[in-house]
Amino acid sequence: MKKVEAIIRPFKLDEVKIALVNAGIVGMTVSEVRGFGRQKGQTERYRGSEYTVEFLQKLKVEIVVEDNQVDMVVDKIIAAARTGEIGDGKIFISPVEQVVRIRTGEKNTEAV
């Protein structure tokens, strides 16, 4: 199994969720995160003064899937989250050794 973590723009969440649900993904975790990459932040104006927002609001979408679903999930996220502008986000893929459902004790595929 693999964990797919996607850092996306907040306004793209609904499109990403719909694309994944339509592809058969039945669960995901979404967290609010802040960070910066190549875009480094942005300059904003408030009451005539400029200031730099160094950490931009993003969302992290986490999904655990079988190995054979990873490419499909990544493709769906890219298609739904891409704007073509700097700041679209990143996708990280990492191995998952074990999953346990707390309520039932089910493990791995049965727990996802």
From Swiss-Prot:
Q: GO cellular-component terms in the record?
A: cytosol
What job does this protein perform? P-II indirectly controls the transcription of the GS gene (glnA). P-II prevents NR-II-catalyzed conversion of NR-I to NR-I-phosphate, the transcriptional activator of glnA. When P-II is phosphorylated, these events are reversed. In nitrogen-limiting conditions, when the ratio of Gln to 2-ketoglutarate decreases, P-II is phosphorylated which allows the deadenylation of glutamine synthetase (GS), thus activating the enzyme.
What stretches pass through the bilayer? none
What is known about its processing and modification?
Phosphorylation dependent on the nitrogen source and spectral light quality.
Q: Which family does it belong to?
A: Belongs to the P(II) protein family.
Q: Sites of the modification Phosphoserine?
A: S49
Q: What is this protein called?
A: Nitrogen regulatory protein P-II
Q: Which organism is it from?
A: Microchaete diplosiphon (Fremyella diplosiphon)
Check the record and name the InterPro entries matching this protein. N-reg_PII, N-reg_PII-like_a/b, N-reg_PII/ATP_PRibTrfase_C, N-reg_PII_CS, N-reg_PII_urydylation_site
Subunit and partners: Homotrimer.
List modified residues, type O-UMP-tyrosine. Answer: Y51
Claim: Isomerase is one of the keywords in the record: no
Keyword Magnesium found: no
Recorded GO MF terms: ATP binding; enzyme regulator activity
Q: Tell me, what is an example of a GO biological process annotation in this record?
A: regulation of nitrogen utilization
Q: Which Pfam family is one of those matched by this entry?
A: P-II
Keyword annotations for this protein? Nucleotide-binding, Phosphoprotein, Transcription, Transcription regulation
